Amino acid sequence: MVKWAWNTHTGIKPLKVPRTDVDPFTLEEVQLILKHVRPDFRNYYTVRFFTGMRTSEIDGLKWRYVDFQRRQILIRETWVNGRVETTKTDGSRREIDMQEIVYQALQDQFKVTGRMEYVFCTRAGTPLEHNNVTKRVWYPLLRHLGLKIRRPYQTRHTAATLMLASGENPEWIARQLGHSTTEMLFRVYSRYVPNLTRKDGC
């Protein structure tokens, strides 16, 4: 369960971060972030970095959609603007296979919030409010580590590049991310993965 720390920066204007298309973290940066992030958020960011889940998907994730037996995360609902919404397209409604690091993170998280409805939640059991998490946890951590300030959505782009770099099948990666084809993978991420070649014959 997430425990909020006192915000010593109350009254300070939030950091302005320009919107960028794709600016993934390196594996070394991911490891640094996970090493130094607040312990109560380590599982949260581990899942983000190694599944590519969208913010609305991970914030709306309920335990009933975590299948430990099959090692899958079922994307069926999202949390958007304080409301639960069902996934509307075949691409967004999907099953994500858990890598071992994700499986272990969710096992650890279950010990903390397993009696709650939501996987990652406040003390009251309500879904995380992503703006609060970003301002209180994400941006301060990046500043502390001296890393380039990037929006949390870059964790999704990072997951894509890490999976491609590790040699995973592009069609499998596309399904994990909710893409209908592999075209976007190569068009968007190829410049971040040295020696990447297409394996789907296209």
Segments (PLM) and residue ranges:
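Catalytic-site neighborhood detector that most strongly recognizes the C-terminal catalytic loop/helix
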Residues: 16, 24, 79, 177-201
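Active-site/catalytic core of tyrosine-dependent DNA strand-transfer enzymes
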Residues: 28, 70, 77-78, 99-148
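Conserved tyrosine-mediated DNA breakage-rejoining catalytic core shared by Y-recombinases
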Residues: 10-23, 27-32, 51, 60-111
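Extended, charge-enriched helical/coil interaction regions that scaffold DNA-processing
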Residues: 2-6, 52-54
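Short, polar N-cap/turn motifs at the start of nucleic acid-interacting alpha helices
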Residues: 65-72, 149, 168-188
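Exposed loop/turn and edge beta-strand positions of beta-sandwich/beta-sheet ligand-binding modules
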Residues: 19, 41, 69, 92, ...
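C-terminal catalytic core of tyrosine-transesterase DNA break-rejoin enzymes
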Residues: 39-42, 46, 50-57, 132, ...
